[in-house]
Amino acid sequence: AVAAATFPLACPPSSTAENIAAFVAENLSAARFAEYLADPDRAVFVARDRTRILGYAMLIHARPTDPDVLAALPEGPVTELSKIYVTPDAHGGPVAAVLMRAAIDDARDRGAGTLWLGVNQQNERAQRFYRKHGFTISGTKTFRLGDTIENDYVMTR
């Protein structure tokens, strides 16, 4: 539920409800998260208070296959910060920073020399957050959202 509720917040304003729903159904369902949790190359971190989940992050400890991403990365072990989202009421608080610290630490502990992510080129709020945590733009890639192709930056640290 948190994944489906928070993903649309990162989408460009031009995104249609249908395209967002298609992405959520394909990638953020309970069944997909069960697969993610069972995958030894993934790590999922959850931030919660006493009653509910406030946010989550997911890492993929594997070299990507997308040629655009590969062109933006150095040689050697890398980890993708695939997802990091917090609920709207947690924006501006410490939750996202705590999740980011957990992601950075886990990538380092697994031997990654580089942590990378993709962020929509229009999502300036997220880009500011990533820069604050040491990420810089190192390339571009595309991202399929339903029946549209979005333009992302590849950011690395």
Predicted segments — roles?
Residues 45, 73-79, 113-116, 120-127, ...:
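C-terminal "cap" of GNAT-fold acetyltransferases
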